[in-house]
Structures are given as C-alpha cells and as structure tokens.
C-alpha cells in the first residue's frame, strides 16, 4: 500500500510536547538542506525510539524503530551512534529538553526522535529532526497509515530524511527486478530495495533474461525464449500482462530511452545492430551499424546519448553514440573486455563490467568523456551487471564471490558492499527503478 500512506505537516509534535523541544509549529523541510558530497564521511546520527502513547501504539513502537534503523543503515550514509545517558536535561521550570551539549560531546550531527499514537485505528508517527551543533530543528512531519503499513510508514520518514540531508532521491519505495533460476527455469523476479517483498513476475517455464524497467517503472522489457529463439517482450507492471514485440530474426538485450522507446539488438538484416522500437512495437529507426555485434544499450538521462557494447574492433568495448549527430566514439580502454554499461541517473558516470588482465571481472565507473575510470570491486569472482539506484547513490550488481551468483549492493563509490537477499538458486542481471 504505497499510495495509501498520508504525509502531513505536523503543527506540534506530541514528542515535542512531552519534552518541550524548541520547535516552531510547522514542517521545516526546505529550510535546511545539507548536501552531502560524494565520498564524504558518514553522518553521525542519534535515533530515539518513537515514544508510544500507550495502548496499541506500544505494540507498534519496536517494529517501527527497527524498520527505521534498518532502513537508514541500508543507505550506507549514516553512522548510527547510541544516545548519551543524559540525552535529556531538566531546566529550572522542571521541563525536560534535549541536551545538545551531551549530543555534541559524543560527536552526533543529527538527532531524530518522535512519538507514536493510535488515531481512529490508524498509526500516527510524528517525527522531529535536529541539527545538533546549532540546536536547530530541520524537519517536523507526521506520517500515518494502517497498522499493516508500519514498514512503509517508517520508510516514508527515512526517505524524507535522506532527501533532506543529501538532496537526492532515496532508495525507499524502489524495486529491483532480476533473473533467478530458483524454480529450475530462468524467470524474472522483483524485490524491494532492501531484498524484501520478493515476487515472481514471469512464469514461462523457459528462459527469461535481461530485464529492464522503464524510467517511470510502469513497464518491463525483457528477452524471452519461449518460442525457441530470443524475442522482446514487454510487461505492464500494473496488471503484469505481457505482450510480444514481434520482429523477424533475433531480438535481445533491451534498454529504455526517456521518451518511452526501447532499444534492442535485432538481427533481421544480418548483422546484430541496435534499433529503437516505439511503445506500440513498431520500428523507429536503426541506430548502430557495424560488422560486429552491438548490444547492451543504456541511455543518458535526457535520452540524447546511448552507451552500448560493440565488438567492431575485436574485443567488446563500451562506446557512446550521440543520437542527434550520429557520431560514435569509444569510451573504454582499460582491460580487454568491457561490457554492460549502466548510465547513472545524474548523467555524470557510467558503470560497466571489465575483465582485467589478471582474469578478474570487476565493476568500474567512468565519466562520459572517458576520464576518471575507477574500480569499485576487487578480490572477488565475477562482479558484473551493475545497475544504479534511482537517486544514483547506490549500485546493485551480481557477484560470484561466494560461489553461486547472487545480488549485492554497494555505495556509488564502492563502499559498504553486502549481499542483498537470501534466496535459493542464482540471481543475476538486476535492474533498479521505482514501480508505481
């Protein structure tokens, strides 16, 4: 129930009323945005457990606290530190207030806390966030929903906090689609950003590969082998109906352009080149032409350029095509084998897979002008298939570091690598986006 959550500005947080915090009676997001630069250290955060106002709210408090903590920890941008013993102090009037001196003494940059109540059978979570050095309130907001939506309520607050502190769209509410052979067939599955809410999308009992979510998350393009040869299919994510995009020859490895067109590799003219296909399945135009196979299209956010893989000079390398001028230039030169480009949502980097001279397969990022090639993974087997989070602050990828191929996530700079979900079989070829 993503759409049933109600977010409203808090006039006066019950949490604040309990402890007499100095906060004006208004939501304050927008008055304070501390943009966290890429590569900066983690934000030191003290998180107070939501104070339950008795009754049903007491039963919800522990679960909401856990969901908020796990959600914020997943982002990799927070250093969660325990609160000081003297978190509150009592003034001359006998009122309890936040002890900002104590928070500063333990290195806390941000404090977040709130109250929890039951109102007409619904959960009401009121949260307040402070920048501790200046004792400045930076966010006041109330979130409400049904009791079975505690996870979504918690993530709504997490999303607001991350947006406030980084200026970027967060991962909360986003989804990852991927391929798994858990059932004995290669089918496409989806899960929440943190590996929860696992769902099987295709049931072809055949081979489904290279899933690609559209930028708005409403459609899923993938390669399907049900007919015996690879063909392009598109799933409507609202009702999960699947339609075939019928073209003669082979159709593989789709990628979405911002205008709704799908780029895919077709072979009906002999060579395997990349074509643009309209939403109705008709051909728009051919965009690459070479003797070697061209595949793995990934577009810049504005849709004017396309990164792709070509073996036109021998080994596969990543190229960039300007769709306006038709000019193509080679992007990658490190390693003997460069594939699977994924253009970042901000447009400033492209992640890709490299086979290095020592035989290791690792993930790199590079700027679109060819500078700044940076290795993100190392010392592990078969790191491949990178896909950016919608905000560009994380990457999901496939790794065989524990034997079978599994999904992992990491920060955009390669930090905080960890396995995404526990699931039987192998998981591969992830694509990350929001699904309405």
UniProtKB/Swiss-Prot annotation:
GO terms for cellular component: periplasmic space. InterPro entries: 6-blade_b-propeller_TolB-like, PD40. Keywords: Periplasm, Signal. Its main location: periplasm. Gene3D superfamilies: TolB, C-terminal domain, TolB, N-terminal domain. It is found in: Periplasm. Pfam families: PD40 (PF07676). Coiled coil: none annotated. The keyword Signal applies. Residues 1-27 form the signal peptide. It comes from the Bacteria. Belongs to the TolB family. This is Protein TolB homolog. It comes from Chlorobium luteolum (strain DSM 273 / BCRC 81028 / 2530) (Pelodictyon luteolum).
């Amino acid at each position: 129930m993503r759409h049933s959550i109600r977010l409203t500005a808090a006039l006066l947080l019950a949490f604040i009323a309990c402890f007499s915090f100095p906060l004006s009676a208004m939501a304050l997001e927008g008055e304070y945005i501390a943009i966290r630069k890429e590569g900066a250290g983690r934000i030191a955060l003290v998180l107070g457990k939501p104070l339950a106002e008795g009754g049903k709210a007491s039963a919800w408090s522990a679960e909401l606290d856990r969901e908020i903590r796990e959600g914020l920890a997943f982002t990799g941008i927070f250093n969660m530190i325990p609160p000081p013993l003297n978190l509150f102090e009592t003034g001359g009037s006998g009122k309890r207030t936040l002890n900002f001196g104590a928070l500063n003494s333990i290195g806390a940059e941000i404090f977040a806390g709130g109250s929890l109540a039951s109102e007409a059978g619904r959960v009401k979570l009121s949260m307040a966030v402070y920048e501790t050095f200046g004792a400045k309130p930076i966010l006041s907001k109330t979130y409400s929903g049904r009791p079975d939506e505690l996870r979504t309520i918690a993530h709504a607050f997490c999303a607001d906090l991350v947006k406030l502190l980084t200026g970027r769209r967060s991962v909360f509410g986003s989804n990852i689609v991927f391929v798994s052979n858990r059932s004995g067939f290669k089918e496409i599955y989806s899960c929440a950003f943190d590996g929860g809410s696992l769902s099987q999308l295709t049931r072809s009992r055949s081979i489904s590969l290279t899933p690609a979510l559209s930028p708005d998350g409403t459609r899923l393009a993938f390669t399907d082998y049900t007919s015996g040869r690879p063909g392009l299919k598109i799933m409507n994510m609202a009702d999960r109906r699947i339609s075939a995009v019928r073209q003669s020859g082979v159709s593989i490895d789709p990628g979405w352009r911002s205008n709704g067109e799908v780029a895919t590799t077709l072979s009906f003219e002999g060579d395997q080149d990349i074509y643009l296909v309209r939403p109705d399945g008709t051909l728009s135009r051919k965009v690459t032409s070479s003797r070697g196979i061209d595949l793995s299209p990934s577009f810049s956010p504005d849709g004017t350029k396309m990164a792709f893989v070509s073996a036109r000079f021998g080994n596969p390398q990543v190229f960039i095509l300007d769709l306006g001028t038709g000019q193509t230039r080679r992007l990658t030169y490190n390693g003997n084998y460069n594939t699977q480009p994924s253009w970042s949502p901000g447009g400033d980097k492209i992640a890709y897979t490299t086979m290095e001279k020592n035989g290791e397969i690792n993930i790199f990022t590079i700027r679109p002008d060819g500078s700044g090639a940076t290795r993100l993974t190392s010392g592990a087997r078969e790191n491949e298939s990178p896909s950016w989070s919608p905000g560009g602050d994380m990457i999901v990828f496939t790794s065989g570091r524990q034997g079978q191929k599994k999904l992992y996530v990491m920060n955009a700079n390669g930090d905080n690598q960890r396995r995404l979900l526990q699931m039987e079989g192998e998981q591969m070829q992830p694509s990350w986006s929001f699904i309405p």
